[in-house]
Swiss-Prot record:
Role noted for this protein: This protein seems to be part of the stalk that links CF(0) to CF(1). It either transmits conformational changes from CF(0) into CF(1) or is implicated in proton conduction.
An annotated Gene Ontology molecular function: proton-transporting ATP synthase activity, rotational mechanism
Keywords from the UniProt entry: ATP synthesis, CF(1), Chloroplast, Hydrogen ion transport, Ion transport, Membrane, Plastid, Thylakoid, Transit peptide, Transport
Encoding gene (name): ATPD
UniProt xrefs under InterPro entries: ATP_synth_OSCP/delta_N_sf, ATPase_OSCP/d_CS, ATPase_OSCP/dsu
Quaternary structure and interacting proteins, as annotated: F-type ATPases have 2 components, CF(1) - the catalytic core - and CF(0) - the membrane proton channel. CF(1) has five subunits: alpha(3), beta(3), gamma(1), delta(1), epsilon(1). CF(0) has three main subunits: a, b and c.
Broad class of the protein's primary localization: plastid
Chloroplast is among the record's keywords: yes
Transit peptide (residue range): 1-64
GO cellular component: chloroplast thylakoid membrane; proton-transporting ATP synthase complex
Organism per entry: Pisum sativum
Pfam family, one: OSCP
Family, per entry: Belongs to the ATPase delta chain family.
UniProt name for this protein: ATP synthase delta chain, chloroplastic
Length: 251
């Protein structure tokens, strides 16, 4: 659990963020023969030949990583709260989470083969075009400088928890086959707010074709509450009811 007290993470980068226009420049980074195009970054990135994610060192390493992520998230949340930018930085993190959810982007920025200066350049371009808060941009540079950019997803999760606690916000994850209309999401959020009594409700959307149709709703501090309105569940129930595996047919 993230705490706002006794945080040790420093949020000062030794590098001053530079702003560039991502729409006019598309540099090609000559790092290997494996190339991919990131529409989010508007860049062609050359991937290192080997994946180099940070080793967690087992359960102890995972625990230490979780504690570090909590410290970074709490420090940033404390700073954002004091500057009245909690909502803005949370919106920034939604975009960052979407970017780093691409495994190729994550592996690229996690690789020690890629120069930190190159990572900062790309992050600077993404921050500029996305309109990030200065604190958000600086925070990403801090993670690059400290070789902990590979913790970004864990940090976002921890920050989200702290934000929800500070603002009495319920996070609702809605998964559907196709993108739902905004008024449908508003109706779902309103119902969850009635169920939980939360002051505010934030919705995140995911797409999952395996649901066939309909949607699922997950909420609660750890996502423990689950509402399944998908056709997939209905089909599974029907299949269970007509299972003939144990029936002996007369010959």
């Amino acid at each position: 659990m993230a705490s706002l007290q006794h945080t040790t993470a420093s949020l000062h980068s030794k590098h001053i963020p530079k702003t560039t226009n991502i729409l006019t420049r598309k540099p090609i980074l000559n790092l290997s023969s494996s190339t991919f195009y990131s529409p989010k970054l508007k860049l062609k990135l050359k991937l290192p030949l080997t994946k180099t994610r940070r080793s967690t060192g087992g359960a102890l390493g995972a625990r230490m990583s979780s504690l570090a992520a909590g410290s970074y998230a709490a420090a940033l949340a404390d700073l954002a709260n004091s500057n009245n930018t909690l909502d803005a930085i949370t919106a920034d993190f939604d975009k960052i989470e979407q970017l780093f959810s691409d495994p190729k982007v994550f592996d690229y920025f996690s690789s020690p083969i890629v120069e930190d200066s190159t990572k900062r350049q790309l992050i600077g371009e993404f921050a500029t075009t996305s309109g990030f808060q200065p604190h958000t941009h600086n925070f990403l540079n801090v993670l690059i400088d400290s070789k902990r950019i590979d913790m970004i997803i864990d940090i976002i999760k921890e920050f989200e928890f702290v934000y929800n606690t500070l603002t009495d916000t319920e996070l609702v994850v809605v998964t559907s086959v196709v993108k739902l209309e905004s008024h449908h999401l508003a109706q779902i959020a309103k119902q969850v707010q009635k169920l939980t009594g939360a002051k505010k409700v934030r919705t995140k959307t995911l797409l999952d074709p395996s649901l066939v149709a309909g949607f699922t709703v997950r909420y609660g501090n750890t996502g423990s509450k689950f509402i399944d309105m998908s056709v997939k569940r209905k089909l599974e129930e029907i299949a269970a009811q007509i299972d003939l595996g144990d029936i002996q047919l007369a010959v």
